[in-house]
Amino acid sequence: MLLSLEALINRKLSTEPAFIEKDKVLRFCDLYSAVAHQVQALTGAPDVIGLLAQNSLDWVIADLAITATGRTFVPLPSFFSLDQIKHIAADANIGLFLYDEVHLNSVTVTGRPSRLITIANSDEEASFDVVPGGMRIIYTSGTTGQPKGVQLGEAQLNFTIEALAKAISATKNDRYLSVLPFALLLEELCGLHVPLMVGGTCIIDSDAAEAVASGRVSALQEAAIAMQPSVMVLVPELLRAWCASLVLSQERAPESLRVVAVGGAKTPLEVISLAGDLGLPAFEGYGLSECGSVVALNTPVAVRAGTVGRPLPGLDVKIIDGEITVAGPNVMSGYLDKELHKGRLATGDLGDIDEDGFLIVHGRKDSVLVNGFGRNVSPEWIEAMLTNDFRIARAVLAHGKDGLFCALIVPTALGQAFFNKDDYADNLAALRELCASVPDYAKPDDFICVGVEEAAAADLFTVSGRPRRRDINNFIKLKFTEAINV
């Protein structure tokens, strides 16, 4: 049984708030009753159930009910394309989709049975028994090819839930502000299962992240002031946007915040430092779906700048031939329809462990660039320097013309005017100046500027901001070809 479900059963009479969404408050007793009715509604349902919905109280109830029935649960992020959703439906053999009204078209194209999420609002008492042995299939958006299904059972999830709660000293007094999709495993664990286990409260506000994406960078600060959270999880781009908002407004983050965990992509050291100066207690971590989403995490009592923290207690993390490898209770059972995973997991990430056990991540093993003189460069090294500048939302270093390094730049709303000016040499000089501390051979020799909408349309990045490098290389080649043909 998941620890969160066990805790919910133990608190089924509690009138304390478990989840808040806008003006709706769901107490633990209400949540238990709603989950019980949803479990009854799933009687006779197929063995594999997919969930495609926006963050909401309905999402929470459906998640817990599917889990309680012991079925295989496939949460699907809203940002997946229709082709990806069709692929997942077939790959996981989803027998039933639960969906909200926004995603009717997405589930219809799969041709699979589907049911609109309807949560019973009944005064009739209901209870449920938990069927053990449920499985989650987490589809990673990935940076190449179709999403792969990572299989995680109760043991793997419970390890991560408990380890996260201990790492951040989670208590029933915590107020977790959720701005990322629950379909992302890290957000589901931190925003749903950890608060449930300790008896805390989760506040759902997906509008804030959407507002930031549309250019209103003050939305996170506004949400935090209104909700006074103690814990949040952000991707680096949202942390940078919040910092930019605070700098512009000359404000500080609410004093209620004690932990802002940051993951999903590399976070520039200077951004972490600036966040702290602005009252944002940002702690960078590292993980992957294949390891229950978390491998290492800086914490309030164990933090080191330039690292992603120490590995979670109970994990055996080693560097083998420069690559981070992991063994332990949260390592996946395997990929769907592949051989069961055994032994140590090679992450594909390059890294080191310092003398005090803090993990340092250098970048992806398969993303190393080689210049014309045979020099190896980890692009993440340069990209972190470029994205230190608030004018740059995202940056990717790739091969351009004649084997030279080309930076693909996605400006922020603040940086659009700078990059829109017709002065290529001045802009390139500014980019190279941001990388002043590295050798000349590692600096960008060229750059291409791409708007947020164009980058999204070309699907150049995952939702957490990780670059799809193969697609970006092809995109850059196409841009140069178009320029030649003009």
Task: Identify the role of each PLM range.
Residues L369, R394, E433-V486:
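Conserved C-terminal "lid"/linker of ANL adenylate-forming enzymes
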Residues G328, L350-A442:
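AMP-binding/adenylate-forming catalytic core of the ANL superfamily
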Residues T307-P313, K318-R344, F358, F373-V377:
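Conserved ATP/PPi-binding loop(s) of AMP-dependent carboxylate-activating enzymes
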Residues L3, N121-Y139, Q146, S169-R175:
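Conserved pre-ATP/AMP-binding loop-to-beta segment of ANL
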Residues R27-F28, M135-E162:
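Conserved AMP-binding A3 loop
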